[in-house]
Amino acid sequence: MSIIKEFKEFAVKGNVMDLAVGVIIGGAFSKIVDSVVKDLIMPVIGVLTGGLDFSNKFVLLGTIPPTFKGNPDSFKDLQAAGVAAFGYGSFITVAINFVILAFIIFLMVKFINKLRKPEEAAPAATPEDIVLLREIRDSLKQR
């Protein structure tokens, strides 16, 4: 069997196609979760915390150079200028994304496992020798 033919069988018959579909759907689903967190959850958290915007929360680790022309309160401007800053707000947003995504995947796996539960097996057929012995017993009882 040629290597190309073996690869075709592997790619088509194996789990490679399932994995590819999963990765594509996962990428699209992650964008949905990002939007839910960014556009729905974080604004509510911002309102509950008095207008706090997590995406721009950081701790300055270095000094701002005198030639810096951006906004010193903007994490993105500081990053673009190469200033060392610890962006914990961005991390909080990503952590919330992860928790939501992990929970949704957990629910999906749980649902799929529930669908996969095997139906209770019908009782196994009685072996022929047992059936024969019962017939003999019943026949002897009748005499």
From Swiss-Prot:
The keyword ATP-binding does not apply. Keywords: Cell inner membrane, Cell membrane, Ion channel, Ion transport, Membrane, Transmembrane, Transmembrane helix, Transport. It is a multi-pass membrane protein. It holds the Pfam family MscL. InterPro entries: Mechanosensitive_channel_CS, MS_channel, MSC/AndL, MscL_channel. Its main location: membrane. One of its GO terms (cellular component) is plasma membrane. The chain crosses the membrane at residues 10-30, 89-109. It is found in: Cell inner membrane. GO terms for molecular function: mechanosensitive monoatomic ion channel activity. PROSITE patterns: MSCL (PS01327). NCBIfam families: mscL, PRK00567.1-4, PRK13952.1. Channel that opens in response to stretch forces in the membrane lipid bilayer. May participate in the regulation of osmotic pressure changes within the cell. Homopentamer. Belongs to the MscL family. This is Large-conductance mechanosensitive channel. The lineage of its organism: Bacteria, Pseudomonadati, Pseudomonadota, Betaproteobacteria, Burkholderiales.
